[in-house]
């Protein structure tokens, strides 16, 4: 299919903790990766919007008979998505991540509330930063997670109009 053809041509890593092959019950891509910078280990967790099933071409997610072959942990409450993200963050932490940076394609404006980036943060713990996309907005905000801890949430708009930089100060734990 087209997505896998593009992925095969790319040199980039593709991450998504919630893009599932419904036939195999496996994720299509690695859910996260851990990179080491000096003595600091940072996990990058990929999160895909469940709206991919309706806001892109739905035929790409079905077989020839029209049966869904992919899913994004979509449900009416958002709990499936929150559970998968939490499971992935916990696994990354258990595997030695000092910090967790979620790379999301979730958005806020025009997105179902249960799948918004700020809602995912509010229903999980352990994410330090969420760098967002999908809704093509520019924002930098702090959102309280499920434990009441502030998480940096940022999105830089569209078409490289702006760019962002996240700085983690490992000696103080400050993130900006």
What label would you give each PLM region?
Residues 1-176:
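Acidic, metal/ion-coordinating pockets
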């Amino acid at each position: 299919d087209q997505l896998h053809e593009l992925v095969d041509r790319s040199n980039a890593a593709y991450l998504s903790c919630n893009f599932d092959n419904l036939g195999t019950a496996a994720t299509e891509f690695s859910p996260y990766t851990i990179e080491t910078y000096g003595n600091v280990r940072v996990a990058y967790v990929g999160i895909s919007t469940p709206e991919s099933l309706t806001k892109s071409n739905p035929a790409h997610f079905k077989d020839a008979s029209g049966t869904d072959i992919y899913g994004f942990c979509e449900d009416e409450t958002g709990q499936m998505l929150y559970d998968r993200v939490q499971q992935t963050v916990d696994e990354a932490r258990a595997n030695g991540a000092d910090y967790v940076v979620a790379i999301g394609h979730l958005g806020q404006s025009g997105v179902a509330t249960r799948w918004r980036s700020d809602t995912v943060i509010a229903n999980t713990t352990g994410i330090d930063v969420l760098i967002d996309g999908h809704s093509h907005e520019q924002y930098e905000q702090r959102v309280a997670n499920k434990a009441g801890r502030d998480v940096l949430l940022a999105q830089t708009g569209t078409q490289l109009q702006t760019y962002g930089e996240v700085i983690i100060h490992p000696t103080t734990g400050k993130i900006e």
